[in-house]
């Protein structure tokens, strides 16, 4: 099952510790990261940038901006640790950059949960050419 989740999240093309981010999104939203957010709107998934279509898409936009602020770590390859305590994500890493990356991922997972009511199936597989120039971070 773990291998399937890793492959699914890799297909989405999310950055960062893909396994942890996929788990966080599943824990917070109950949705599979790959199938629900892999091509959502203009900002969810790798290489996708544009003016957010809704609050759900804005979560992904803010997540990309959060990653741009990271220093001294590689959001595509570095891994961090976190735990799930009392239905709460707890980032726990001694490396400051990995801690920041975990906090970015935690924030997007919570944002996606808080905006489940804005999730629009018509944006689930949204073509990139429909996206307008993105706002600045």
From Swiss-Prot:
CDD domains: PLA2c. Keywords: Disulfide bond, Myotoxin, Secreted, Signal, Toxin. Disulfide bonds join 42-131, 44-60, 59-111, 65-137, 66-104, 73-97, 91-102. GO terms for molecular function: calcium ion binding; calcium-dependent phospholipase A2 activity; phospholipid binding; toxin activity. Belongs to the phospholipase A2 family. Group II subfamily. K49 sub-subfamily. It is found in: Secreted. It comes from the Eukaryota. Residues 121-133 are annotated as: Important for membrane-damaging activities in eukaryotes and bacteria. Pfam families: Phospholip_A2_1. Expressed by the venom gland. GO terms for cellular component: extracellular region. InterPro entries: PLipase_A2, PLipase_A2_Asp_AS, PLipase_A2_dom, PLipase_A2_dom_sf, PLipase_A2_His_AS. Residues 1-16 form the signal peptide. GO terms for biological process: arachidonate secretion; lipid catabolic process; negative regulation of T cell proliferation; phospholipid metabolic process. The record marks 121, 124 as: Important residue of the cationic membrane-docking site (MDoS). It comes from Cerrophidion godmani. Snake venom phospholipase A2 homolog that lacks enzymatic activity. Is myotoxic. A model of myotoxic mechanism has been proposed: an apo Lys49-PLA2 is activated by the entrance of a hydrophobic molecule (e.g. fatty acid) at the hydrophobic channel of the protein leading to a reorientation of a monomer. This reorientation causes a transition between 'inactive' to 'active' states, causing alignment of C-terminal and membrane-docking sites (MDoS) side-by-side and putting the membrane-disruption sites (MDiS) in the same plane, exposed to solvent and in a symmetric position for both monomers. This is Basic phospholipase A2 homolog Pgo-K49. PANTHER family: PHOSPHOLIPASE A2 FAMILY MEMBER, PHOSPHOLIPASE A2, MEMBRANE ASSOCIATED. SUPFAM superfamilies: Phospholipase A2, PLA2. The record marks 127, 130 as: Hydrophobic membrane-disruption site (MDiS). The record marks 128, 133 as: Cationic membrane-docking site (MDoS).
């Amino acid at each position: 099952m773990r291998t399937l989740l890793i492959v699914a999240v890799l297909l989405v093309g999310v950055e960062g510790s893909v396994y942890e981010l996929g788990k966080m999104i599943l824990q917070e939203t109950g949705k599979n990261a790959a199938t629900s957010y892999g091509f959502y709107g203009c900002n969810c998934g790798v290489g996708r940038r544009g003016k957010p279509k809704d609050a759900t898409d804005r979560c992904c936009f803010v997540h990309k901006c959060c990653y741009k602020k990271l220093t001294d770590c590689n959001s595509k390859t570095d891994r961090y640790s976190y735990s799930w305590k009392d239905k709460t994500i707890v980032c726990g890493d001694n490396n400051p950059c990995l801690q920041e990356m975990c906090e970015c991922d935690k924030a997007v997972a919570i944002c996606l949960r808080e905006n489940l009511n804005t999730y629009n199936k018509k944006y689930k597989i949204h073509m990139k050419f429909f996206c307008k120039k993105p706002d600045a971070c």
